[in-house]
Amino acid sequence: EVFGLYRWKDVFGPGHHLQINIEGAAFGYFDLDQSQTDLQNIDFQLGLPVVYRYEDFSTRLRLLHRSAHLGDEYMARHPEIVTQNRLTDYQVDNNLFDAVFSYKPDWWRIYGGFAYLFDVMPERDPWEMVYGIELAPWDQYAIHPVLGVHFHLQEEFDWDLNHRYVFGVEIHDWPF
């Protein structure tokens, strides 16, 4: 989730807005094949994005920390991870700086950017790239459909294309 901390309107002249945000999330992964649905892994991320907007153009610069941790139930079922001192083989920890540039003239948005990872454990190639398009037709209504396609490429995987297609309903400006 992203929360705005402070916004400057017309900071560099009329229509130039700058905002500092904080973002955080936790993603739990459960073993649904077990009767107790044990927590296998939990991923955390904490970031400090700065967003600049002028008319239809926006830019997000962000420092982000990401980490993944094994769940207690998983380690209890696999004690060899702890006894063989292999815990660091399963931990993922990195920081990144990313920049994403966006153009949103009306009911569609196109974006693209890059990320550079640093302080990475385990060590890996540092560069990533993202781009995509989002469509929100009929966005003048409080409830409307949205769809998009997101592409993610990583140097670590020889720039193989990873893509995600999204469809949903957006609710905004609800009249109460």
Model-derived features with residue positions:
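N-terminal low-complexity, intrinsically disordered segments
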Residues: 2-4
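Short loop/turn motifs that connect adjacent beta-strands in outer-membrane beta-barrel proteins
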Residues: 6-20, 56, 104-108, 135-146, ...
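Outer-membrane pore/translocation modules
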Residues: 13-132
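Outer membrane beta-barrel transmembrane domains
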Residues: 120-176
